[in-house]
Amino acid sequence: MSKNNSKDLTVGSPTGLILGFSLPLLLGMLFQQVYSLMDTIIVGRFLSVSALAAVGSTGSICFLIIGFCQGVCAGFSLPIAQRFGAKDEKGLKKYVGNAGIVSVIIAIIMTALTVLLCGQILTWMNTPGDIYDLAYQYLIVIFAGIPATILYNLLSGYLRSLGNSVIPVIFLIIAAVLNIGLDLLFILVFNMGVFGAAFATVLSQGISGVLCIIYIAKKVPLLHVSRDDLELDSSYVRNLMVMGLPMGFQYSITAIGSVILQTAVNGLGSIAVASMTAASRISMFMMCPFDALGSTMATYSGQNVGAAKFERVKKGLISASVIGSIYSVLIFVALLFIANYLIYLFVSPSETDVVAQAHQFLLINAFFYIPLVLVNTVRFTIQGMGFSGFAMFAGVAEMIARSLIGLVFVPIFGFSAACFASPLAWILADAFLVPAFIHCLHKLQKAKSSQVTSL
């Protein structure tokens, strides 16, 4: 197969390969953050405060549902990466076909359930009556577009499993630019309101999925499947579910902890909410390299486990952790000098209380970025090795930490306690993940390479 369409991560310098694979992912993630910011500005500036509040009120439930779908698709790509590393073309194609069929089933079920329960979900979330209708208009479209979300995430996962991180990012950037243009078209020209904003998101996501289909059809014969590959095989489906469902639940479990923490901060008043919102927006940009390294390690470890190069997995994890740790130190030092200026992008310098609390949140979290590096690199490495269940339990540890801070310590110590929620979550997750990685590596080293996918 052409080197332009795939990348073998089982040979060569781990550090160089990890950097080369993660940089395109980082570019895409940064672009996605810029798009998200622009989308918020468009809704807030060209519609109304109520529209902005309506869209914002659906954020946690979207993270819960859409995150589950994204996690499942990411998990489905892992056995494909393993088969690619093992040079098992027949097994790879069988996983591609079975993952496609299972994804269609999941898309139908998730879409039907969420669309039918959309109104009830908003009621359960205590959505204010004055924005309920707007929130429903937005959320029902997002839920109806779940198939488009699954299409892009599944196919981009296929490509990344073959070591191609560039093409999915190009299509993601195209979708983001298109989304902004469609936002302006649907909101300013067609006066479609929040419905238009949601439709723009779904349509651009669907187009990026179609672009993946076209690219795979023309350029990636390794992902072309036969009718036999589309016939469900219980052993393949079981492995897909064992890897996919824990990753999906991991996203959802993390979302639950974040919702509980946000609810606690909401009780502290508007200044605390504004402070955390501004600091969180900045943190999302700062954390993109960690996410890129994590996604890289899932593919890297998957391919190398498939090739039975277990010691190479360990070397890659060390390289990724060192890269992330160096970045962590540099960004913490930088924030000591520029944190306030970044906060001024969101609030006026005259809002001294907001600036002070946001500054506190940023620096406390940044001080603990090295534990976050390990959360991302170790967790995704374990997932790529085929042990997604362990990674899910780490997500439970994070949820417990954030929930504990939100329910117990925020009411007592206020905003300062909220600043330590994520650091505590990262440390607890690491306390589980590091021993889990050692256990998984030891188990694989004792197993024959032919048994890897059945673990």
Predicted features, each with a name:
Residues 30, 34-53, 122-129, 185-192, ...:
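Helix-terminus/linker motif at the lipid-water interface of multi-pass membrane proteins
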Residues 20, 43-63, 129-134, 194-195, ...:
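Interfacial/gating helices of multi-pass transporter permease domains
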Residues 20-39, 141, 175, 204-208, ...:
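Transmembrane helical elements of multi-pass membrane transporters/channels
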Residues 1-22, 80-145, 189-245, 301-368, ...:
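Short alpha-helical transmembrane segments in multi-pass integral membrane proteins
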